[in-house]
Structures are given as structure tokens and as C-alpha cells.
Amino acid sequence: MVAEWKDAGGPTGPPRWIAPLHLHRNDDEAWYVLEGALCVRVGNEVVEARAGTSVLVPRGTVHTYWNPGPGLVRYLLVMTSNIYSLIQDIHAMAERSPAALRAVFEKHESELADE
């Protein structure tokens, strides 16, 4: 599945992650940047992808991503139907406590990671 997303960025300072640090046990995930820049942490490495570039996160790899600046970033998220369902379930959550998030990630064969 492919979905277009965007993030308007934010104030300077520490990264404001778009997703918590996590991994997918059985699913790869990729980003293709259409406009702006997107930082993706892949394991212990940080990749800054600019318009026209992509980043692949292999299954089992801890990752997160964020807009590194105040400007707009637009990107395509290439994902399996399982990851898409995970995102939909997260957006539908009334309560996003750590325990509730962990349960949703586990349901989709994924897990939250510690820093």
C-alpha cells in the first residue's frame, strides 16, 4: 500500500517524532520524499532524505522518523496492509497510554522500542 502524508514541521529543538521508536517483526517499510526533508532513524543510523530520495527500513529494525525543520515535508509511505491497519488502529484510539499503544503494536506483530 502507498499513502501520501505530510508534516508541517515545528519549532527548533529536539526531534518531534511522527511515530514512536518501534519495529515491525514481519514487515518492511519505506518512505519516498516528495518535498522537503525527512529524517529516518534506521537502527542506530539517522538518514536525512530529501525530495527525490527514499529510505527502506527492513523488518525487525528499530526505527522512527521526523521532519527535521520548520518547513513542510511531503512523503509517500510504502507499507504492507498490516502496517496500514496498525496506523488506522492508532488513529482510532481514544486513549494512547503506553500500555494501550503496546497492545495495539503487538496486535500487528510490531513492538515499541526503548530509547
Identify the meaning behind each predicted range.
Residues 17, 38, 85:
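Hydrophobic small-molecule pocket/channel-lining residues, especially in calycin-type beta-barrels
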